[in-house]
Amino acid sequence: NPNGGAIALGHPLGGTGAILLTKALHELERTGTEHALVTMCCGGGLGTGTLLRRV
């Protein structure tokens, strides 16, 4: 994340996915790029990822 990550993002408990996706979408618009990848640790050895494509 070129604009900071982890604690630097600042978000309420349970809002991690929403804030990461929102920031990724804003970054797609700002830079004019086509793809963004959002990954997140869920704890307990789990993780999730989402690939976004701007159309």
Predicted features along the sequence, with ranges:
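Claisen-condensing/thiolase-fold acyl-transfer catalytic domains that form or cleave C-C bonds
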Residues: N1-V55
